[in-house]
Every structure is written in C-alpha cells, then in structure tokens.
A protein has these predicted regions:
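Interhelical loop and helix-boundary elements at the membrane-water interface
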Residues: 1-23, 52-75, 102-112, 148-170
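Interfacial segments of multi-pass membrane proteins
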Residues: 3-6, 26-33, 71-103, 116-125
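Short alpha-helical transmembrane interface motifs in multi-pass membrane proteins
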Residues: 9-10, 79, 134-137
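Nucleotide and nucleotide-moiety/phosphate-recognizing core
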Residues: 10-16, 21-65, 83-88, 96-97, ...
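Alpha-helical transmembrane segments
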Residues: 23, 93, 143-147
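Loop-to-transmembrane alpha-helix initiation sites
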Residues: 90-91, 106-114, 129-141
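Mobile late-domain/C-terminal helix-loop "cap" segments
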Residues: 120, 136, 140-150
Length: 170
C-alpha cells in the first residue's frame, strides 16, 4: 500500500521497518526472557496486533465509535519468523515472491507468509525438538491475517480482487 501511494523507496522503507517491528519484539523477548518460549512466541503477535490496530491511525466512524486502523500484518508476521530463526525469513520471503508472481494475489501472498511459518516451525519442532510455541505463533499470525484480510478474501471469492504478477499478463 505504501509503495502504491508514495513510491518504491517509501514502500521499501515501510516494509523493512514493519519486518523489523516483528523481528525486534522477538529479539528483545529472547534477550530478556531466553527460556520463556511462550513469551517469545507471543511477542510478535503483539507487534502484529499493534500494526493492525494502531492507536496512531485511530478514527471515529459515523456513529462516533473509535476505530483503530492499520495494515494486515504480513510484514510484521514475516519479521516474527525472521526473529525466531533468520533462515525462515529468507525461505518465506522467496516463497512469498514466487506465490505473488505466479498466483498473482497480494492477499494470498500475505496469508501464505504466516502459514509458511507455521509449517516451518512445526517441522523444526518435530525434527529438531524446537518449542511448539513458535508453530503456535504461526497459527495465531495466520488467524490474525485472515481476520484482517476479510474484505480481500470476499473479493477473491467473488472474483473481484486485483491480479498482479505473471497471471496478470495472461
């Protein structure tokens, strides 16, 4: 959204800062509470919630109710995964670029970011004995992204969502 509204550099800067928002919470939690895997796993959940429901983007609706604005949390979700295990961030980023290019829907790409982290950390828990808390993070992040992207999902199901990437040229 930032890239569409203000150009490539603003969009890139915004994406980097949003990724660092998620990763930074994990790094801080790991530093201060290295043995509390559940607290570490929930740190980026709160970053996603703060991103999606920012007090800095608060508005009143027509009935006067306060509505907190924000994004979907995809970049913050990627950052959370990056904070747990940096190779996961690279794996997810590469797969997300491929999904975006070949599937062509930004919302599907955003949802896949958290879903991929669930699979990666479930695999690490099974194979390497990692804490299951990180896989649970992926499930919660996926749920938050699905909730935030409800309008996009409705457009997808109706066939009205914007197409990007390779499929747009077909």
């Amino acid at each position: 959204n930032a890239m569409r509204a203000a150009g490539f550099l603003v969009g890139l800067s915004t994406a980097i800062l949003d990724i660092l928002k998620g990763a930074g919470t994990v790094w801080l939690a790991k530093y201060f509470f290295p043995d509390n895997y559940w607290l570490i796993a929930f740190a980026p959940v709160f970053a996603i919630l703060g991103h999606n429901y920012s007090i800095f983007l608060a508005q009143r609706n027509d009935e006067g109710k306060l509505k907190l604005g924000g994004g979907a949390g995809g970049a913050a979700s990627l950052g959370g995964s990056l904070g747990f295990w940096w190779p996961s961030g690279i794996i997810i980023f590469i797969l997300a670029v491929l999904i975006f290019y070949f599937v062509g829907y930004a919302s599907v790409t955003t949802i896949s970011i958290a879903l991929l982290s669930t699979f990666i950390f479930a695999y690490k828990a099974i194979v390497d004995g990692w804490p299951w808390a990180y896989a649970v993070y992926g499930l919660i992040a996926t749920s938050l992204l699905l909730w935030s992207l409800r309008p996009n999902i409705k457009r997808l199901l109706a066939g009205d969502d914007r197409l990007h990437g390779f499929r747009k040229t077909m």
